[in-house]
Amino acid sequence: MHPAAEHSPLGKSSEYIATYTPSLLFPISRAAKWAELGLTAQTLPYQGVDFWNCYELSWLLPSGKPVVAIAEFSIPADSPNIIESKSFKLYLNSLNQTAFATVEQVQTTLEQDLSTAAGKPVGVRIRSLSDIEGEGVATLPGVCIDDLDITVSSYDRPQPELLCCDESQIIEESVHSHLLKSNCPVTSQPDWGSVVVEYRGAALDHSSLLAYIVSFRQHSDFHEQCVERIFLDLQRLLKPEKLTVYARYVRRGGLDINPYRSTETLDVNNRRLARQ
């Protein structure tokens, strides 16, 4: 378990506070997890963002009438801190019985509080239900590798040694899998996700990639660090000209987390998948 996470509200019974309480937010430094991967804030080999989508945002108008909305949060991948997910939920719940004059006031409040917790500016977008109703669900780019036949014997740790490639072939492709699963490092609850790999480099063996993704199945780590580990393992193997790893996780407690790491300029459509 991440040492700071032991002191977070995750996995503990909590009082649900219904009036605005920004102190509920619990930041966790990224530094310890970066160190496990041999990284520091100054040596990150990627740029990126963590997209959080909130489906349970509500507050009151001055008249006392409730408003409901959906919010998108963009936390920079190089921010000093992540925000522990249960504390994020508790904080958002604290808006439920709080009056705001305008949606802009809600947005400004969220931007200020989340940026303070993350240690870097956090983007906030608040959308009405009617804005989203016609969007439907997205499909992931490239080839789905989930139907490949593989033999799996171990699930307790990520196994980069399973990965292999053909260095004689340099290709550019996108592949994806819906079989990503890891466990919360605090509660051991399952985290279900889909992952996209886009790259230009030595041709990656698809069966080996699928076996590697499945090897995360009993691994305990936060969503963000799982994606960073995948990125680094593929970067070491492929030595690619460009590489993007992007995961979309199933929501829990009204929030889903979608980490994006890339050697390239951010270019992603934050649209939900069928399981989200």
From Swiss-Prot:
Q: Which keywords label this protein? A: Cytoplasm, NADP, Oxidoreductase, Queuosine biosynthesis
- Which EC numbers characterise this protein's activity in its record? 1.7.1.13
Q: List localization entries.
A: Cytoplasm
State one molecular function term (GO). preQ1 synthase activity
Kindly give the InterPro entries that the UniProt entry links to this protein: GTP-CH-I_C/QueF, NADPH_dep_7-cyano-7-deazaG_red, QueF, QueF_N, QueF_type2
Which GO cellular component terms, listed alphabetically, does the Swiss-Prot or TrEMBL entry include? cytoplasm
Query: Which reaction is recorded as catalysed by this protein?
Result: 7-aminomethyl-7-carbaguanine + 2 NADP(+) = 7-cyano-7-deazaguanine + 2 NADPH + 3 H(+)
Which residues bind NADPH per the record?
85-86, 252-253
> Which residues of this UniProt protein bind substrate?
83-85, 223-224
Enumerate the Pfam families for this protein. QueF, QueF_N
Q: Which domain of life is it from?
A: Bacteria
Under Gene3D superfamilies, the record lists:
3.30.1130.10
Q: Which residues form the active site?
A: 184, 191
The record's subunit annotation is: Homodimer.
Known PANTHER family for this protein? NADPH-DEPENDENT 7-CYANO-7-DEAZAGUANINE REDUCTASE (PTHR34354:SF1)
Q: What does this protein do?
A: Catalyzes the NADPH-dependent reduction of 7-cyano-7-deazaguanine (preQ0) to 7-aminomethyl-7-deazaguanine (preQ1).
UniProt protein name: NADPH-dependent 7-cyano-7-deazaguanine reductase
Please give the organism.
Answer: Pseudomonas savastanoi pv. phaseolicola (strain 1448A / Race 6) (Pseudomonas syringae pv. phaseolicola (strain 1448A / Race 6))
The major lineage groups are: Bacteria, Pseudomonadati, Pseudomonadota, Gammaproteobacteria, Pseudomonadales
